[in-house]
Amino acid sequence: MNLLSQFMKPKNKFSIENLRYLHNTLKKNQIITAQNKNLIVESLRQIAEVMIWGDQHDNLFFDFFLEKNIMGFFIQFLAQKTSTEVTIQLLQTLSILVENLRNENSIYFLLSNNYINEIIIHKFDFSSEEVLDYFVSLLKALSLKLDKSTVNFFFNHVEKDFPLYTEAIKFVNHKETMIRIAIRTLTLNIFKVENKEMREYIINSTAVPYFSNIVWFIRRNCMSLSKVLEKSNHDSSYQLKDYMDELTDQFYYLHDIFNLGFESMNIVLAEQFIQYLIYPVFIGSLIDPLKNPDLEDRITPTLALYLLAHVFNIFSFKPLLDTISSALLTATQSQAQLFTSATTAPPPLSTIASNRRHYNSFRRFSSFPNLESLEAMKNDGITSISDTDGRIGASGRLLNNTSTDEDSPPNSGFKPSNSVQSTSSSPSTPKKYQQQFSRLFGSSRKPLPTTPSSSPKPSTTSSITTSTTTTTPTTTITTTTTTTTTTITPSSSPSKQNLSSSIESTNSLNNNNNNNNNNTTANNDNLESTQPKEDNLPTITVLNLNSPNENSTKDDNNNNNNNNNNNNNNNNNNNNNTTPTPSTPTRKRFKFNRNEFKESLLHLIGSDRETFGIVIMLYSFLKNQHIDKRILEKGGMLPYRLALLEGLLSPETNNNNSNNNHHHHHHHHHHHSKTTVTSPNNQQQQQQVSHSTGGIKGQKNSKMSASLPINIGHNRSRSESHAKSLLFNPNLYDTVTLEERSLFKTPSPGSSSLFGELEIETNKTDEGGDEKDEYDDGDDESSVNIRIKSSKHNSINSSVDSTIDLSKNNNNNNNNNNNNENNNNDNNNENNNVNNNNNINNNNNEESEEEEFVPVPESSQKDFTRRLINALFMVLVNSNQFRLVTLQMTLLILKELVYSSDSSSKLTETQALLLEQAYITVTDNLKECLSGPLSEVFLEIFEEELRSYKQIIFESLMEDVSLILPIPQKPVSRLSLSHRLPSGELERTQKAVQQFLVLRELKFTLLRKKDTMLPLKQPPTPMVKEKYLFNLETGVVESSYDIIEYHHFEKVSGPTPPPPSGTPRKRFTHYGVLFHNLLLAVDPPPSISSSSSSSASTSGSGTPNSSIGGTGGGGGGGMGSGTGGTSSPNPSNIIGGTNNKGIYGTIVHIAPLQRLEIETSHRDPSILRVTSHPTTWNVEMVFDDSTQCSKAKQMLERVRDDVRATKMRQIYALLGEKDPDDDSVPPQLNYGNMVERNPTNSDHDSNTTLNNEHNLLSSNNNGEFSTSMSNTPPSRVITPIDTSNSHPLANILGSDDNISFVNNNNNNSNNNNTKKTTSTVNTPISTPHKLKKGNRGSSSNSSLNDSILPTLEDHLRKTVSPKVDMFNTSFFDDTLDLKELISTDELNNGNNNNNNEDNNENPFSNIKRNSNEVKVGQPVQQEIEKEKEKENIIGEDVEKETSIEQKEIKKDENDNNNIVEKEEEEIKDDNIKEEIKQDDSNNKEINNDNSTTNNKEDEEEEIKKDNKDEENIVNIEHINEKEVQEQQTEEQVEEIIKESVDIKVESDNN
């Protein structure tokens, strides 16, 4: 059976027998031929399936797999190289096994021998893409199984062989994207494994060639991206985006490597990244091509800035960022040489093999201190990085080339790796390596322990020469590139000190010695090209870790500084003797300027494209939290980090200490300045100096940063005296340069602070010294005053000078100043000046106490910072030339530079003027748009832009590479407005609004003010939602909202056939309620809707029944009609009883009044179309006649215009302008009294519960619902409330309230009318409307009949003096209080015209004055009697006047009714004419054969038409006659009023 089983395929696929069968198949077919090729492929595929099943179920499978050595057959098949199919299947089988094995023992079984390594190093034919894909997939699968134990299966620590890694990295730059991604994943998995021997192998053997090739590949991609950028446009930017995505992926891959914590490898990677990419490409491309002609790979400045922004945005490795930041802000000569030096491609990775011997040929670039030198420095007790041949490292530090390899040239940048592999390079060495690197780059300020020693030992690995003196040894460190000599003389008594303190003191010493050497070698022509002008954090520092007592060191140093100046030439000779010079000197390309990068930035600010690159680079640079803040301070990018500056810049401190500072500075500037170092003998003197130069109040020994200026205070310097002249100076950025003074910090022993006691360097600061050499042409004169290099100063515009003089405003008394808004209000209310001045002054006092902006002196900002901020403000001044995205990023970068959350913004006077000028510019632009062709829709544009305005998201901005493309001249559909310039009036208006919002935000932020005018204020409105119930019947309570009753035709939906001709369409009654600033579409109860649908006449007489469940009514509005209106109301749902006052309609839509579109239908003038924007709700309001339609249109348009005018007044006030449509100051709307009710008749107070806070429903039957109602009352009902003070029509409509009584209460007596009207005399009159139930016909049912009567308004305006407040009184009131009118008139005259008693416009002006005169000497009783007589006379006159007026009003009403009827007839005639024209056109097209009959009909119609025209002419004549009669009646009324007034005046005089 066993014999047969070997030849027969088992039925069970997952069994040992099947695995044995597959093994026998491979054994029989060990030589691949064309016949057995497919059989071998199938067998290999089945082996993978069986082994995976066995891994999860039975361990015997792997025992058999190892026993039969099946992996050996795999090696045999690979060695034949005859079939690609077998090779692919073999690699796939291995990948499946490695990926799916879960048992740890199975993985060990598979990897325990060297078969996997032999397969890895096999020479595959990678010309086949499938072979390469499966090979890389196998390598990636193996890397996923790596850990501390499994790595030993791949890495041979004896032979230093790691084939999995060395073979994989050859494909890191492959053209296939998926292969590159797989190799990145593999290398990251390998770097994660914490195996010391493996990491040592990687750092010593493959790190330099691997990382150099990666960075070179990124460099090639940058060049390709630059070429694509030049050819691309916004319509074809997809290829550009693909290149940028690939480049970003590469950056994130390097970022992931940095985050692994492989410290020594991170240093090598940073070194290659800087050497091949950052310095020569990114920074070198920003330097002027004339100064850098040898740069081969140059990209556009915009792309270089954009890529630098990505570097600062992605990377977080502190040493890397500190090195780049130092090179950008304070570049040394060595760094500048790397900016302009040409680099060659590194050796390819294809030369790397699995044999260890091949790795020795690679030489790593030794710009960083290598492991051997660190170990030597540890043994010698001296930490020193110096260069014996003057070569420069990639990071700008001096290189340590101690190689003894004779094959290496003197200036070679590579070092043989055999020195790195010495026994001193232990796995623990990289930590020391990183500590040394971090210390030199300023990444750590923690003190490190030092080893005490009596004297340093000489070392052969460093260029340190030791000389002895009689007392103490002196260690002299020489550097040929800087031509300076720094001598440190340690004391014999050892002591420990903080490393950070050593760095600070050494930096100060090096800076002072450099200054001294500059003075002694001023005649040297090559000085500026060889001498660094500023102490730089990454610059080489010479430290003695066995530091003895610091005090004696500093004393000796002070004594040796003078000898250093006199013996400088001798020291240089010694340097030449002890240090070999380079064999090939570097050719001088241009005059070295350490601020070359900063000058390039300032030069590029001007065009939109380059400015955008600068602002995103600076923002990414400043927002990176991993950059050492000291570098930013020294470079002028972070001048206000310490809160201590607030106390130093206070005017009080400056006034007390300015004279002392001046005297002290001249005392220390007699000769070449130098830093005085703290010692026990001069501690007291130092404290006095520190105290005299300023500090925090109440503290004698203030400790300050070196970045603080020495001119502390508010005295105006010479640069500030002409600050205004710089505003419109075309050479704004080059006219002023400052030589700043700063206070240097010197560490003191035992001090726990980061900074030592205060010391003064009176000649130069970190940047000031350089600026002196650069701008002042070597002038060495010492002066406290700030010097200016400017030969011409343009005068500032006088208008701006008078408008924006911030310095004067700071010293003026706030009690005498009023802001522009208050002044405008005072001009409109001249009579209230005395009363308002105190309030305005008090408000100004409160604002000034909260925050007062005080410009900082020019000296508080470094030259580069000041010029950069001024340039960015000039971008805002010329904001029309820049895109919105550039302006928004400029806003963010200015906030980073000058804004402080703890104190006022650090703006100089010039910068404050530029800010104000920019704000005035954008405000003027917006004013032009406000009066432009889009003025009618300006409010909508402004609100939409304000709604969409938001802060920019920097991360999303960095992902949009199209922003660095040339700005398109034509609009691009896929490009938003913020990313391009506007095209057309609409886009220009939108951009003007956005510009205004950006500048307003910046201004109020920097000045620390709260914007109280944005967003625009909305009038408070009670919350209303759809499906709420609205009380349409208010009973006897006089409400102040308007109701428009209209009809809506039933919509035919579905396959229902249209009704036969002549059949009237069903229509339903609906209501439009003008509720505050909203139009509510309300469905009435089914009873009203059904009754109105039966006919166009009125619903039944009496009080209609209303259903609480009104939601079943018609559809209402434009929502369609409901089915409830067509059926008879259900008696069970009807509220019975005669006392039922509530009629509840359902709100079906809420439309803002501001954006209503109102138009009359062209088909029927009695139909009004109302559309609500931005929603799609629309409705066709059908009225009984065209007159009602026109009145409804007039009302809606007037209300809409009032709502819009309210917001437009806010916009005008925002721009500092007066509304041109507002001739007088309107009464302010009182939005606070939202729940007040109009006074009502006392007879109905017991039947209403509107004042109850807990009952929002209008009650019936004394506050209770009838038993016929539903068990559950409505959950939410909107009860009409008094909105007379907030309704837009409150100030327009005068006496419609009384008209409603005239029209709808004919059956009532006049006494009842007078009782009702007297209760509303003193309240603003609106247009309350109830549901009309009269029997005057369908036209009288509509509330529109009582809405607006233009003729009556004109009549009232003519008959009554303008000084009488028509909105607070009513001439239809039978009990009009004339005395109240007279007193109100006189009061208004006193307030508005400065109590001018000679004003004759008001006929009642003399009445009150004469009536109040009291003759001296008359008894009081007689006066009282006369007053009573006067009152009686006045009362009689008033009654006569009111009766006359009522008669005239009735006549006017009749005339108006006649006019309305005539207008209806005219409209009908017009409709008939239009129908005739339409019929004519239709008849001509349809019936051409029946021309004779048509002509007859036309003749008849023409005859009818002529007849109607004649009738119309007669009607017009009647109308003219009536108009003449009306004018006569008006004149009569005026004469009567005048006569009555004269009578009253005479009676008063008598």
From Swiss-Prot:
Name the UniProt record assigns to this protein: Protein CLEC16A homolog
Query: What organism is this sequence from?
Result: Dictyostelium discoideum
**UniProt family annotation:** Belongs to the CLEC16A/gop-1 family.
Q: Which InterPro entries match?
A: ARM-type_fold, CLEC16A/TT9, CLEC16A/TT9_C, CLEC16A/TT9_N
Q: Name the UniProt key words of this record, in alphabetical order.
A: Autophagy
Region annotated Disordered sits at 382-588, 653-723, 744-859, 1086-1137, 1236-1283, 1301-1347, 1386-1513
**Pfam families hit by this protein:** CLEC16A_C, FPL
Biased-composition ranges, Basic residues, are 661-674
